[in-house]
Curated annotation (Swiss-Prot):
The modification N-acetylserine is found at S2. This is HAUS augmin-like complex subunit 3. It comes from the Eukaryota. Component of the HAUS augmin-like complex. The complex interacts with the gamma-tubulin ring complex and this interaction is required for spindle assembly. Interacts with EML3 (phosphorylated at 'Thr-881'). Contributes to mitotic spindle assembly, maintenance of centrosome integrity and completion of cytokinesis as part of the HAUS augmin-like complex. InterPro entries: HAUS3, HAUS3_N. It holds the Pfam family HAUS-augmin3.
Length: 603
């Protein structure tokens, strides 16, 4: 036991509270000093729990200190102890039987002492004889030790070389096994390196939550059959005023409800406009009457008016009112109905425009929400594909590593078998018990012959006797070949580094093309995206052209509805394109009718 451990044990004996937390090796440096070593050894050997004051004694001492009485210390305490009278020790008298027992024990101890002295003398004689023998054997031992040291030096060099290679191999294997340990060992001892070691529960739960939220969002934002309505929203469905025209929509009930709703809206709008006109007219009449009353009051207050002039004014005003009423009745009966008939469709235009605006706003809203959902789905698909690609890459790497490890295991097993065979050959007594070394190699020394064959290679010339000199020559040639191979390896390493630098440059160029100077990976080619943008711009232009064509078609239909001559021209063109014979018959009938009318007019 070390001195520090003894010191800690004595502290435990005397009841030091924190002795269990102390380490004995941390106190070994205390015993290195010459001055403190004797005291510490005395402390470790003599001090025990009896030298420690109890709690009662400490309390009594503290009470004594508080009382103010003098306490003896040092020399005064020594003098007081000298003056104290020692108590007389009364030794009890022993019996005769006890004395006889003690005498017998003394005799037996003396006999044992004599026997041990005789054994000591015999051992001294034996030691002298063995010392003479040891002197004789020292010369032989020195010669054997020299040979042993030489052989041990060779073996130690080989062992150190093999141990270094094995240590390097074990370090590399441990580093490799750190990556392939099971992930249940914990993150403290096994840092997660591969993607397959990470759990996908959190990622999958998040994806499930996002898909659930996306489905709820689509259910809330889109009603059932939205794509059918959007696909069927052509120009004929938006002509809500023309109730007589058949609709393309298959559901006649929805179409009828929509027509009734539009008719109600148009009627409500016309009624509101009618009430607005009446209110404006009444408001203007009230303003004019108030103005006239103010003027009349002003004229009455400014100067007195005669009754005759007032009657004349009233009669003139009544005549003017009669004329205005006649004009109003004429306007109501004659001009107003024609104007109302001509502008009846204009009254319905705000309602139709509002309906169109509402449908366009709904369509824009749904397209925006569809784009959001589409972007989210594209992100999820991209993340899944990226994860799948990374797993496939890692699986390929693991398969390659597994193949390499299998090949390594096979090579190691083969080398292990060869090593066991060589050890069996070395245990052969003809090889191990050879005392006088000779230049020629024994034919039974299979390991040396095999070594010579390995070093020499394929040599057709066979020698009868193999010597150690030949073995050294072959080893020297092998050394030269190894130096040449090392030079070639250095050149190939330089070429490999140049090849790697070139590949790194290619990788950097590829990264530049993929990232385009940014931090995000471009999943598509820049040229393709530009072409897609061009196509989108062309589609937008095409949409504008289609809207212009639809507007032109609407205006032409309005003109056809208002002009009968254009309607007839259109019918002629339709007949001309569909049925030429029918058109000829109609033209001939019209010519005959015109001739008959001309003849009747001449008559």
């Amino acid at each position: 036991m070390s001195c520090g451990n003894e010191f800690v044990e004595t502290l435990k004996k005397i009841g030091y509270p924190k002795a269990d937390n102390l380490n004995g090796e941390d106190f070994d440096w205390l015993f290195e000093g010459v001055e403190d070593e004797s005291f510490l050894k005395w402390f470790c050997g003599n001090v025990n729990e009896q030298n420690v004051l109890s709690e009662r004694e400490l309390e009594a001492f503290s009470i004594l200190q508080k009382s103010g009485k003098p306490i003896l210390e040092g020399a005064a305490l020594d003098e007081a102890l000298k003056t104290c009278k020692t108590s007389d020790l009364k030794t009890p008298r022993l019996d005769d039987k006890e004395l006889e027992k003690l005498e017998d024990e003394v005799q037996t101890l003396l006999k044992l002492k004599n026997l041990k002295i005789q054994r000591r003398n015999k051992c001294q004689l034996m030691a002298s004889v063995t010392s003479h023998k040891s002197l004789r054997l020292n010369a032989k031992e020195e010669e054997a030790t020299k040979k042993l040291k030489q052989s041990q030096g060779i073996l130690n060099a080989m062992i150190t070389k093999i141990s270094n290679e094995l240590q390097a191999l074990t370090d590399e294997v441990t580093q490799l096994m750190m990556f392939f340990r099971h992930s249940n060992l914990g993150q403290g001892t096994n840092p997660l390196v591969f993607l397959s070691q990470f759990s996908l529960e959190k990622y999958l739960s998040q994806e499930e939550q996002s898909t659930a939220a996306l489905t709820l969002y689509t259910k809330k934002q889109f009603f059932q059959g939205i794509h059918e309505v959007v696909e069927s929203s052509n120009e004929d469905n938006f002509q809500l005023l023309d109730i007589q025209t058949p609709s393309i929509c298959d559901n006649q009930e929805i179409l009828e409800e929509r027509r009734l709703e539009m008719a109600r809206l148009q009627l409500a709008y016309i009624c509101a406009q009618h009430q607005l006109i009446h209110l404006k007219a009444s408001n203007s009449s009230m303003k004019s009457s108030i103005k006239w009353a103010e003027e009349s009051l002003h004229s009455l207050t400014s100067k007195a008016v005669d009754k005759e002039n007032l009657d004349a004014k009233i009669s003139s005003l009544t005549s003017e009112i009669m004329k205005l009423e006649k004009e109003v009745t004429q306007i109501k009966d004659r001009s107003l109905p024609a104007v109302v008939r001509e502008n009846a469709q204009l009254l319905n235009m705000p309602v139709v425009k509002g309906d169109f605006d509402l449908q366009i706003a709904k369509q824009d809203y749904y397209t925006a929400r569809q784009e959001l959902v589409l972007n989210q789905l594209i992100k999820q698909k991209a993340s899944f594909e990226l994860l799948q690609l990374s797993y496939e890459i890692e699986l390929r790497k693991h398969r390659d590593i597994y193949r390499q490890l299998e090949n390594l295991v096979q090579e190691l097993s083969q080398s292990n078998m060869m090593l066991y065979k060589q050890l069996e050959m070395l245990t052969d007594p003809s090889v191990s018990q050879q005392i006088n070394p000779r230049n020629t190699i024994d034919t039974k020394d299979y390991s040396t012959h095999r070594l010579y064959q390995v070093l020499e290679g394929e040599n057709k010339k066979k020698e009868l006797f193999l010597t150690h000199g030949n073995l050294e020559e072959v080893a020297e040639k092998l050394k030269q070949n190894i130096s040449l191979v090392q030079d070639q390896l250095a050149v190939s390493a330089q070429e490999h580094s140049f090849f790697l630098s070139k590949r790194n440059k290619d990788v950097d160029m590829l990264c530049d093309t993929l990232y385009q100077g940014g931090n995000q990976l471009l999943l598509s080619d820049q040229e393709l995206t530009e072409q897609f943008h061009k196509v989108e711009s062309q589609l937008n232009k095409l949409n504008h052209l289609l809207t212009d064509i639809l507007a032109d078609v609407k205006t032409k239909r309005k003109t056809l509805a208002n002009n009968k001559l254009h309607q007839m021209e259109r019918e002629f063109y339709v007949y001309f394109l569909k049925d030429e014979d029918y058109l000829k018959d109609i033209v001939e009938n019209l010519e005959t009718q015109s001739k008959i009318k001309a003849v009747s007019l001449e008559d």
